[in-house]
From Swiss-Prot:
Main location: secreted
Keyword line: Amidation, Cleavage on pair of basic residues, Neuropeptide, Secreted, Signal
Localisation per UniProt entry: Secreted
Region Disordered, residue ranges: 90-110, 150-184
Family the UniProt entry places it in: Belongs to the FARP (FMRFamide related peptide) family.
Protein's job: FMRFamides and FMRFamide-like peptides are neuropeptides. SAEPFGTMRF-amide inhibits the activity of dissected pharyngeal myogenic muscle system.
Protein name: FMRFamide-like neuropeptides 3
Pfam families attached to this UniProt entry: FARP
Tissue-specificity statement: Each flp gene is expressed in a distinct set of neurons. Flp-3 is expressed in the IL1 and PQR neurons.
Cellular component, GO annotation: extracellular region
Signal peptide: 1-23
Keyword Signal belongs to the record: yes
Length: 184
């Protein structure tokens, strides 16, 4: 049986351990990554005890400049802030150009050139496009005749009187189109 002195000693050691663990800063387990900037002297999580800590920032939102937005300077480990943001949560990315009066969400991308204003973000125009009614994302690569549809490729050499369709390849020395001769 355990003596009362041992129980009291065990209780005191347990209390000392609990007090010491509350006094030390909390560390994240091994393998967790911290990226982005964070205040060094901050050990308290945001709204952990039901009140706002003293190190919150008041920053005006770009959407509505009349009401301020409360943000925590210390974000939890692993949260990334990249790009510009207003009231969106951390980790939302804004890339490309965005019309400020348009109500498109963050993360919509505009790349390439866009002609019409009603085309959606994220539609890509690559290569040259001749007629205006061809949809975005159609690619023209290689040389083509005017009656050939977009996206047809001509590679290799083809004579003007050759009846082979586009996309047939001539490589090496040949008798018929597409047959290959290796070596000497």
């Amino acid at each position: 049986m355990i003596s009362p002195n041992h129980l009291i000693l065990l209780f005191c050691v347990n209390c000392a351990f609990l007090v010491a663990s509350d006094a030390t800063p909390k560390r994240s387990p091994l393998g967790t990554m911290r990226f982005g900037k964070r205040a060094i002297a901050d050990e308290m999580t945001f709204e952990e005890d039901g009140y706002y800590p003293s190190n919150v920032m008041w920053k005006r939102s770009t959407v509505d400049s009349s009401e301020p937005v409360i943000r925590d300077q210390r974000t939890p480990l692993g949260t990334m802030r990249f790009g510009k943001r207003s009231a969106e949560p951390f980790g939302t990315m804004r890339f490309g150009k965005r019309n400020p009066e348009n109500d498109t969400p963050f993360g919509t991308m505009r790349f390439g050139k866009r002609a019409s204003e009603d085309a959606l973000f994220g539609t890509m125009r690559f290569g040259k496009r001749e007629d205006g009614n061809a949809p975005f994302g159609t690619m023209k690569f290689g040389k083509r005749e005017a009656e050939e549809p977009l996206g047809t490729m001509r590679f290799g050499k083809r004579s003007a009187d050759d009846s082979a369709p586009f996309g047939t390849m001539r490589f090496g020395k040949r008798n018929p189109l597409g047959t290959m001769r290796f070596g000497k």
